[in-house]
């Protein structure tokens, strides 16, 4: 038995969580688990336990939504076609608040999704093979930005509980109006897609339907190890770990059906 599995014996968590973690740990290491388990052993902090529960169901044992899997698979191609807007073009608009993609994103307008376009940046002359058709790429982008808009409109679901930045690339001008260097523009594309990926896949991932059901069962009827006596305390621990929970399912018309989890009503 490895050290990580032995560490489970000291964690006062629901039996089903401990069994799930044991199965995972027997197959591979889980990033951050050992440190959190050691921290709990050292100071008995409920924060460490809360983090273990959250990471178990939202990361270590969670399944990515299909569009997130495709995002990872086609990352480079999506970066090459990532939506952008020149600050210079905003200056020439009659009504920027309704015409500018940046302004629409800033106001979390649902109209922004229909205004987006995904042409390759004009000054990117490097030829790279495309694995997606234009239609497939458009659908993929729509789902990514539908997901992002959902979170941007609900900062209480985000990891930082703060508002998210605009997800498109904004290409500024120099103080005297000249274009910025192309190398800087390329870096803007790299940073922006990395930011959106981090928000959707790492910081605030959707909870799989299976894990939502598992957590609901635990909160409704905790199963305690022999050395844990308080069901109420364990229940509250799991409730706190579910903050920010939401689910995503495919919808035949809407693309994605994204909802705040029913677990939030139990907080």
From Swiss-Prot:
Protein name (database record): Genetic interactor of prohibitin 5, mitochondrial
Keywords: Mitochondrion
InterPro entries: Gep5
GO cellular component, one term: mitochondrion
Domain of life: Eukaryota
GO BP term (any one): mitochondrial genome maintenance
Purpose of the protein: Essential for respiratory growth and required for maintenance of mtDNA. Required for cell survival in the absence of prohibitins.
A Pfam family that the UniProt record links to this protein: GEP5
Main location: mitochondrion
Family assignment from sequence similarity: Belongs to the GEP5 family.
Coiled coil: none
Entry's localization field: Mitochondrion
């Amino acid at each position: 038995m490895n050290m990580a599995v032995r560490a489970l014996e000291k964690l006062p968590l629901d039996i089903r969580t401990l069994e799930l973690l044991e199965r995972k740990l027997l197959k591979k290491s889980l990033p951050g688990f050992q440190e959190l388990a050691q921290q709990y052993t050292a100071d008995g902090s409920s924060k460490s336990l809360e983090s273990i529960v959250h990471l178990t169901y939202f990361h270590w044992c969670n399944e990515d939504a299909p569009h997130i899997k495709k995002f990872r698979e086609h990352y480079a191609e999506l970066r090459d076609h990532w939506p952008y807007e020149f600050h210079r073009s905003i200056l020439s608009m009659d009504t920027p608040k309704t015409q500018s993609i940046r302004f629409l994103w800033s106001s979390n307008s649902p109209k922004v999704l229909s205004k987006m376009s995904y042409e390759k940046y004009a000054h990117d002359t490097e030829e790279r093979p495309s694995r997606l058709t234009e239609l497939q790429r458009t659908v993929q982008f729509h789902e990514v930005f539908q997901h992002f808009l959902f979170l941007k409109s609900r900062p209480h679901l985000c990891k930082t509980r703060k508002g998210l930045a605009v997800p498109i690339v904004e290409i500024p001008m120099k103080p005297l109006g000249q274009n910025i260097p192309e190398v800087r523009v390329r870096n803007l594309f790299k940073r922006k897609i990395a930011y959106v990926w981090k928000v959707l896949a790492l910081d605030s991932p959707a909870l799989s339907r299976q894990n939502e059901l598992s957590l609901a069962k635990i909160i409704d009827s905790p199963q305690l190890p022999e050395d844990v006596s308080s069901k109420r305390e364990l229940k509250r621990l799991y409730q706190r770990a579910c903050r920010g929970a939401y689910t995503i399912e495919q919808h035949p018309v809407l693309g994605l059906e994204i909802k705040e989890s029913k677990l939030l009503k139990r907080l």
